[in-house]
């Protein structure tokens, strides 16, 4: 990686603004439902604290302003509390990993937990060194930052409560920059957005470096894209071909050895071949594109593998009509919702002997049981291939959820925190949040 990282600079005693990605699902009870992104940022947070920095954490959560506008237009209630990072703050305070973190050479241990709670269990009650700001800019926040001591952490409130964040507004970026001496981007999941906290802020903070998670993401994805160990197999799923065209074309151009396509996007390919797809999701405007993709794959010597069977339901009786049939025998009243057992076996065999695997996107309607079976089967196949020597990279919400649901997270080489960012990077696009960082 040709970007400077937090390890390349001296941060002791400095105010370090770390852009993290804490855009995590929060349940109605206020508990974090998936802490993957939070845990991904912990090495950088811990490193900064141990080096004696005054740590400022900033993140977005959802799209509060857009959702507020929609609620007002529909005359619906708007709950501002669901967009607060307060729940993340409570979660951070109780993390065992952030206990007993001491600054280098200090006499007193710096501790980041003080009360029990959250889904991770109980944390020992100790001195509280993690704080929460009720805002992300302004005089009150400035005062809180000035009170920070070395090794202490301040989590700012949701950046997207201000329109200037998504607009990459210079004034908002300047206000964020005034809080710090050093900028660290550790939010790979937001690196494809040119927002005030991912790009604009670097106009005002000249020291702008990558965090440890950002470094890890870029190293894994760069190797997969530019110098993969072969055979190289990519698995793509999800609803729409249109969302994946750039990454498909990039993978074919780089001559991925095998390209496995599942999920609803497969039906656009089936219809382009003349198959009847019933009421399955199809992008009719993408039919010619699907044909062109198949031609390009063939010309490049890329083995493009589509499902051979799928789980379907009758659109008129979805609760009682599930069955598995060959894809070419789909009549007009059926809806395809997952890959079948035969396809799962074919995909598993396609991964045998692979040395590099990239997977993004579910194989079916993962959020509805039993149509998560195909995605879980692929997760198991990827984990098995990893145990047999493959480097595996999994990105995208449903793909990562499948890995976690199956208890396979420890068996995957790298679980990417990026969804759209991962896809754009694999498409060969330079991400704004990465481009803004200092070169080595």
Q: Which residues make up each language-model segment?
A:
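Active-site loop-to-helix "anion-binding N-cap" substructures in soluble metabolic enzymes
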Residues: 1-440
């Amino acid at each position: 990686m040709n970007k400077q990282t937090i390890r390349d600079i001296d941060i002791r005693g400095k105010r370090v603004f770390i852009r993290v990605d804490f855009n995590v699902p929060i349940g109605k009870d206020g508990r974090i439902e998936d802490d993957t992104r939070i845990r991904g940022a912990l090495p950088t947070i811990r490193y900064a604290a141990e080096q004696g920095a005054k740590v400022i954490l900033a993140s977005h959560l959802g799209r509060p302003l857009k959702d507020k506008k929609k609620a007002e237009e529909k005359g619906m209630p708007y709950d501002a509390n669901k967009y607060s990072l307060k729940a993340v703050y409570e979660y951070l305070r109780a993390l065992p990993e952030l206990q007993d973190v001491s600054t280098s050479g200090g006499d007193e241990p710096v501790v980041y937990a003080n009360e029990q709670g959250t889904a991770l269990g109980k944390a020992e009650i100790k001195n509280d060194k993690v704080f929460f700001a009720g805002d992300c800019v302004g005089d009150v926040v400035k005062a809180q930052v000035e009170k920070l001591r070395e090794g202490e952490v301040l989590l700012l409130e949701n950046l997207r409560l201000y329109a200037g964040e998504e607009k990459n507004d210079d004034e908002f970026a300047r206000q964020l920059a005034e809080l710090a001496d050093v900028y660290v981007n550790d939010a790979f999941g937001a690196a494809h957005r040119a927002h005030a906290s991912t790009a604009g802020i670097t106009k005002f903070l000249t020291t702008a470096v990558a965090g440890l998670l950002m470094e890890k993401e870029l190293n894994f994805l760069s190797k997969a894209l530019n110098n993969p160990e072969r055979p190289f197999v990519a698995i793509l799923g999800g609803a729409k071909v249109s969302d994946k065209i750039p990454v498909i074309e990039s993978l074919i151009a780089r001559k991925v050895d095998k390209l496995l396509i599942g999920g609803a996007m497969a039906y656009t390919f089936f219809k382009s071949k003349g198959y009847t797809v019933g009421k399955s999701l199809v992008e009719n405007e993408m039919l010619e594109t699907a044909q062109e993709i198949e031609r390009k794959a063939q010309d490049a010597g890329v083995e493009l593998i589509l499902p051979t069977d799928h789980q379907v339901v009758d659109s008129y009786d979805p609760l009682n009509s599930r069955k598995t049939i060959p894809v070419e025998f789909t009549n007009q009243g059926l809806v395809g919702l997952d890959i079948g057992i035969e396809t799962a076996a074919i995909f598993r065999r396609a991964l045998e002997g692979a040395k590099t695997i990239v997977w993004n996107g579910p194989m079916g309607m993962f959020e509805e049981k039993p149509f998560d079976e195909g995605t879980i089967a692929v997760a198991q196949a990827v984990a098995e291939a990893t145990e047999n020597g493959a480097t595996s990279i999994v990105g995208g919400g449903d793909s990562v959820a499948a890995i976690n649901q199956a208890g396979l997270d420890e068996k995957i080489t790298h679980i990417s925190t990026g969804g759209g960012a991962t896809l754009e990077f694999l498409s060969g696009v330079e991400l704004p949040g990465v481009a803004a960082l200092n070169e080595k």
